[in-house]
């Protein structure tokens, strides 16, 4: 079995380490020669360090990883088998039929009336806990985005934040102008907390480890394949920053939750409960509204790199991960084949509500470090959406990931449009319930039916 040797060696090494410590303690009390004692202590320390390094080498663990699950070898083998095999055998399905079935499932689900999650712990405006979660609304924007981000803020304030008063945090790789800062403050209540931060060049610019000549060559190839933003270096910087850097910014150190807000998006329905408190009280670490397939050309080696990482750190895997969502090869089998094993399903991160504790955890941080060393943010066009989604699907319990079906949201060209009760004025009528996109040729880019089918528990389904 793949992981049997580790399970045999770990307890043996632990016993050896304990014996070394015990010998040191005994000698401490038995010897009076200070020089000899120091030599013994130094020798014991050296042996301990050597043994500990051997332990870490064999287990793939760091010191703090001892708190992570120590999976049974048989369980790990089962998970790894699932991650190495497609969900469906080739020639057992017709992608066109799968698409038709998935589209029907999605539309039927969205046409069910909804007002809010059916839980008994929603926090309303006026409740002592309303607006008190450690959360902020985050925007990574340029000075030139002022008009478009104002549009997004005004809608979010009207539909949600005027009742809860959560602060805003704005980040930019350049200094914000007075015009930008004054423009933002002018549309918000005077007591609304607003902070503006600059991203340091080390956290934004292309790392020195990237071979500039290779980057130029690879992006030239992608550009010829009409891959969007391939040759826009700042886009690569943004994807890397939102994958592995933003949650380290000093302005975010005091927060547990972030709600990401992009320029020029639309909100269609009132949200009458504190979303951050919902996350906190219902053990959710991630919230999304749209769930898409990615362009496989941009992430050609992301899955194989991820699997290499998982093989080195199997203890990071969550036994209740969203593995089937990652491995469903039935709607877009070409994506799966191109990436050598990944459906390319991902949460569209232009809207995300995320628990920063997950991003600051050892599995996520180690994963980011590994991907950074691979260089795929620049040699390919790895996006923060597939990167974040892979980490969540592999390292988190899928029940802690929540689809906010009740939130009406649009980012061109896709929409999450719920059906509000007929006697309700919660939604403004500016979107068509269940209509994912106006362009039918983009319907095959919707991965939400796959999430419904494979990842939503009965509890999640009953929540709406």
From Swiss-Prot:
GO terms for molecular function: alpha-1,2-mannosyltransferase activity; mannosyltransferase activity. One of its GO terms (cellular component) is Golgi apparatus. The chain crosses the membrane at residues 12-32. Its main location: membrane. Its EC number is 2.4.1.-. Residues 33-130 are annotated as: Stem region. Keywords: Glycosyltransferase, Membrane, Signal-anchor, Transferase, Transmembrane, Transmembrane helix. The keyword Nuclease does not apply. The active site is at 352 (nucleophile). It comes from the Eukaryota. Belongs to the glycosyltransferase 15 family. Present with 5240 molecules/cell in log phase SD medium. This is Probable mannosyltransferase KTR4. The lineage of its organism: Eukaryota, Fungi, Dikarya, Ascomycota, Saccharomycotina. The gene is KTR4.
